[in-house]
Amino acid sequence: MEKEEIKESFDILLTACCTQDDKLGIAYKQMRDLLERLCRSQMPNESLQMTDLSARISFVAARIELSIAEQNRLHTFRLTSNAVLNRREVPQREKLLRDAKTIAFFLKKLSGTDIPETLYRLLPKADATYIVAPLAHKQVERMRVCFQYSDEFFLY
């Protein structure tokens, strides 16, 4: 991807994040068009004809080795934008910012370019779906058990 194209993509996300509440539907349309363009740019010479965005996301995700969580976030955006664009769901700023963060990190992975600071400051900081640390498993060392009687296999 060219630097100008990357900058333009980040600018689209920045504009979407700064959109007024009554224009969030338009912002979703712009973000969805951006995601489609990014996916198509990663498969220009493919003879594979993929008409739906879901297939293109999965293809590109496999090609650039996105984690399952990253793929799920892209598909979550796709489903949310479908609902908003088909007027089954009212667009919400929190979801729009979550989805802008998803696309920004996808673009960062595609281009190797850092997210501009002005955009990064607008994105949500804490999001349970972005936790990268593995879950901690604490081993139980001692346990107190109360029981009335026992047999060979169980405590009652």
Write out the residue ranges for each language-model feature.
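Amphipathic alpha-helical interface elements
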Residues: 1-156
